[in-house]
């Protein structure tokens, strides 16, 4: 499409609050040839990058959050085995601003589900495999999640 201006923007909306997330966007990530127009339309900070970088960043963000969910589920399992109160351990752990409490809450369903986390972590693992890169931490995250979601 040499005569067209195309822009790519990965969405980081949460399914449960997509409209609110969209209305309260503080930063847009854009890539492609048609990015300048978006600066005139949206009055938010806009970061312009290569589309491939943005695609990989989207997968990385969601994979990291899936990993965080799995980590806290494993901490829950350890607390249960040691007869230690998980909510206290999670609270004291997430007090560290670098960690934060997002994705640390254990639900009855356990692990991560929904549409984006499973799709994106699997896409990142498969992309790495096709390029002869081993993402063993993420592969184990997928396997662990599969095991706890089955039970």
Give the label of every model feature segment.
Residues 108-112:
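A short glycine/serine-rich beta->alpha loop
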Residues 143:
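Ferredoxin-like iron-sulfur electron-transfer modules
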Residues 1-9, 13-101, 127-133, 140:
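Internal alpha-helical scaffold of NAD(P)-dependent oxidoreductase catalytic cores
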